[in-house]
Amino acid sequence: MSLVYMNIMIAFLTSLLGLLMYRSHLMSSLLCLEGMMLSLFILSTIMILNIHFTLASMIPIILLVFAACEAAIGLSLLVMVSNTYGVDYVQNLNLLQC
């Protein structure tokens, strides 16, 4: 495994660890999700370029489309929660609260 692959995997694992550790605020969770998507995009692009698999060249672009949709929905949810409750705690998203 080359050093580039290891660095990208470490970036993905760091973002995953951040998502698991700092899940009290919605903004921290969204930033960690964006880091995970960015590292997945870079990893898939490099792997497709290295193995010369031209049929799968659309996969990174599709991944970017899903990342953009995820970011838009996450930011709209963040604005809605911040306007409603005044803070961006994830515990405010529980729909089972009375």
From Swiss-Prot:
It is a multi-pass membrane protein. Pfam families: Oxidored_q2. It comes from the Eukaryota. One of its GO terms (biological process) is ATP synthesis coupled electron transport. Keywords: Electron transport, Membrane, Mitochondrion, Mitochondrion inner membrane, NAD, Respiratory chain, Translocase, Transmembrane, Transmembrane helix, Transport, Ubiquinone. GO terms for molecular function: NADH dehydrogenase (ubiquinone) activity. Its EC number is 7.1.1.2. The keyword Electron transport applies. It catalyses: a ubiquinone + NADH + 5 H(+)(in) = a ubiquinol + NAD(+) + 4 H(+)(out). It is an enzyme of class 7 (translocase). Belongs to the complex I subunit 4L family. Core subunit of respiratory chain NADH dehydrogenase (Complex I) which is composed of 45 different subunits. Core subunit of the mitochondrial membrane respiratory chain NADH dehydrogenase (Complex I) which catalyzes electron transfer from NADH through the respiratory chain, using ubiquinone as an electron acceptor. Part of the enzyme membrane arm which is embedded in the lipid bilayer and involved in proton translocation. This is NADH-ubiquinone oxidoreductase chain 4L. It comes from Mogera wogura (Japanese mole). The gene is MT-ND4L.
